[in-house]
A protein has these predicted regions:
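Substrate/ligand-engaging "lid" and interaction regions
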Residues: 1-196
Length: 196
């Protein structure tokens, strides 16, 4: 939504408000195989040798592995299963290297991703859906890495006062979307100024 643009609204300690357009997102895709065009584009991106890193912020719950999803084979519905399916496409394209980076604020976030991806890959090998070399590929840290990261700034949900201020300034299409999972997205991000 929002033409892949966002407005950063920086709330300074002096009471000043600084606004900047964030235009670094070039494409938005739904990571769901039932959206066939979006999924085909994701496969194309994962098969591209120029891809060096993927990152996501999905909350700690997003790293879960459910037995029922493991049994779905190469058509998982959970996020980590989808990441593993896309890594399999990268494997088939030449065992290309990739950094898989969690941006979630949880302890050992890279290990959570690695554990989930390895679980899917191992199950798929056991089911005879992928070759054992795929599991070796995602376990080879010279090919696929899952680094830890520390996030020191959490972006709050869209603030109604900031939304009203922007509307008063003439900022149109200033609506907040609440997803099925009760997460919030808006065409603006409100945050306090970095203190250090």
């Amino acid at each position: 939504p929002y033409d892949n643009l966002s407005l950063l609204v920086c709330l300074k300690s002096t009471g000043e408000i600084e606004k900047k357009v964030v235009a670094s997102v070039t494409e938005s895709l739904k990571a769901d195989p039932s959206f066939t065009e979006d999924w085909a584009r994701l496969v194309e991106i994962f098969q591209n040798p120029s891809l060096q890193m993927i990152s996501f912020t999905i909350t700690e719950k997003g790293y879960g592995v459910a037995p029922a999803d493991l049994e779905r084979g190469l058509t998982p519905v959970l996020a980590m299963g989808k990441v593993t399916a896309l890594l399999y496409e990268r494997f088939k394209a030449g065992k290309l290297p990739l950094t898989v980076q969690s941006m979630d604020n949880c302890s050992h976030n890279g290990d959570k991703v690695k554990t989930a991806v390895h679980a899917y890959a191992a199950k798929w090998v056991e089911q005879g859906l992928v070759p054992a070399e795929f599991l070796a590929y995602v376990q080879d840290e010279t090919k696929v890495t899952f680094p830890w990261s520390m996030i020191d700034k959490i972006t709050p949900r869209p603030d109604a006062k900031v939304q009203k201020m922007l509307a008063d300034d003439g900022f149109e299409d200033n609506y907040t979307i609440v997803t099925e999972k009760h997460t919030f997205t808006a065409p603006f991000v409100n945050a306090e100024e970095t203190q250090y």
